Amino acid sequence: MKLSDRGLFALALHEGIVPGPYWDSVRVLTYGIGHTAAAGEPNPADLPFGMPDDIDFAVKDAVEVFKRDVAKYEADVNGAVNVTMAQHEFDALVSFHYNTGGIRRATLTRKLNAGDREGAADAFMGWSKPDEIIPRRKEEQKLFRDGSYPSGRAIVWGCNESGAVLWKPQRTYAMSEFLALLRPPEPMPDPLPEPDKPMSGTRFAALLAALSAALAGGYHFFFGG
């Protein structure tokens, strides 16, 4: 399975977008849309600190990293869960795993694989440290249980050269705008050839006269007229 469009946007709402390395709430160096070294390249420690000169370009780069990360976490959830999932359940689990990295050892996964969906939903709240994460965990629990997706706009936050987040929005994206960043525009189809211009009355009359003359000449040739 893959994240739905609403699942992708919900994840961006939870993570936010920071176009430079920053320290998260538990002092893990992070970049872009929740990317850490644990997810693979790039290592946030190797990136320049502070706000980039071109924010729009930096956001596009962060989105490219996000796409690679999402594919990894989707595969992890698909590998850990051995029962059929509804789309909203899968979206909630990927969001949970993207944040915790704990899908393979979580009680909620064991309960889900045992067929205890309600117990799995309850177990989301077993991962509620630090306190700042509780609202997100409740949103993931609600999504898993009821299919209720969060709403809002994905926010691009600033950061400084020390890796501190500056809580002043630099950009915001509606879901359609964020999804457009994830997917390049469709190539334009080749233009259709222009239709032939209709023949003018004068040209048509001249062609008809030439055809009549040719037919008449043929008649004289065959019949000696």
Give the role of each language-model region.
Residues 11, 31, 89-97, 121-125:
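Short alpha-helical scaffolding segments that buttress acidic/His motifs in well-ordered protein cores
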Residues 23-48:
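Substrate-binding/active-site groove segments that recognize
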